[in-house]
């Protein structure tokens, strides 16, 4: 209905993307005791299709549907199939590469995991303001609101919720990109998020007393439990994209995260992923 309601002058361009890659995470379960930390790697697949509508010379709307999958080497309960969609609106305040822009987006998805404790629906809202300062350098800052609705409630403790993956959070970020050449683009992003986080560990009294949801998490072992608590996560991310041709690229990202949670609990994780992306 949204597409049909767009006025006649809008021109549409079909979009089709596909990607395949690998990822590694040093602390998948976000544990804070070294004996409980679990690392793993996965193969990732993704595809998206949709349309871009040029509403005017300064406004554009992109509507896409997407599917993604992650297949883990050791912890098969994390294997994922996700389906979703995104609406993204972008307005440019003027002509030329130096004119600033604003971006608004809304996305929703359903994530189905092999271990059904993680099955959930997600909603994300994002707003961004950015500017290209030179032909090779741009920067932006923005904010996100995330809501995840858990599909299953499996409490491990009486009178305490088992919907560990029923989460909400807000974040702010700043990012920048620099085109070293026609082929190589480098990027960096800093973000801070405040909201619900999940840590999976063996039974632990310190985390138990500050948690508001607890459930058994057999993905990581029969004696592991997932705990939901409040926390602040600081993230630093570095990216590099190498254009192979007009339609494909090889993309690398390294991410470092530190979370300070309730009760003085602190955990860190490092992740890296390499993705081949193709666009029609």
Predicted regions and their residues:
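Membrane-embedded beta-strand positions in outer-membrane beta-barrel channels/transporters
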Residues: 44-48, 82-88, 124-126, 171-173, ...
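Repeated loop/turn-to-beta-strand initiation elements of outer-membrane beta-barrel proteins
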Residues: 56-61, 94-102, 133-141, 182-187, ...
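Surface-exposed strand-loop-strand hairpins of Gram-negative outer-membrane beta-barrel proteins
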Residues: 24-46
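Outer-membrane beta-barrel "beta-signal"
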Residues: 242-243, 267-280
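Detector for outer-membrane/organellar transmembrane beta-barrel domains
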Residues: 126-221
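Residue-level signature of outer-membrane beta-barrel architecture
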Residues: 49-54, 89-93, 129-131, 135-137, ...
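Transmembrane beta-strands of outer-membrane beta-barrel pores
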Residues: 20-28, 51-53, 67-73, 91, ...
């Amino acid at each position: 209905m949204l597409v049909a309601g767009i006025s006649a002058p809008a021109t549409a361009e079909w979009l089709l993307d596909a990607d395949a890659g690998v990822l590694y995470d040093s602390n998948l379960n976000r544990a804070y005791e070294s004996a409980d930390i679990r690392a793993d790697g996965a193969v990732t697949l993704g595809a998206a299709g949709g349309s871009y509508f040029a509403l005017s010379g300064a406004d554009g709307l992109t509507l896409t549907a997407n599917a993604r999958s992650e297949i883990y080497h050791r912890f098969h309960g994390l294997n994922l199939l996700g389906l979703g969609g995104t609406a993204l609106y972008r307005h440019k305040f003027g002509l030329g590469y130096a004119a600033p822009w604003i971006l608004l987006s809304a996305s929703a998805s359903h994530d189905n995991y092999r271990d059904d404790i993680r099955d959930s629906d997600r909603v994300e809202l994002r707003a961004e303001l950015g500017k290209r300062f030179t032909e090779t350098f741009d920067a932006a800052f923005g904010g996100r609101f995330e809501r995840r609705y858990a599909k299953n409630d499996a409490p491990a403790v009486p009178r305490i919720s088992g919907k560990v993956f029923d989460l909400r959070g807000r974040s702010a970020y700043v990012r920048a990109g620099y085109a070293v050449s026609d082929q190589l683009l480098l990027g960096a992003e800093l973000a801070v998020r405040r909201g619900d986080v999940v840590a999976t560990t063996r039974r632990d009294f310190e985390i138990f007393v500050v948690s508001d949801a607890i459930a058994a998490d057999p993905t990581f072992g029969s004696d592991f439990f997932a705990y939901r608590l409040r926390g602040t996560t600081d993230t630093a991310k570095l990216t590099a994209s190498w254009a192979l041709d007009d339609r494909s690229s090889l993309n690398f990202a390294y991410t470092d995260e530190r979370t300070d949670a309730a009760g003085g609990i602190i955990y860190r994780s490092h992740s890296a992923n390499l993705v081949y992306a193709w666009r029609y």
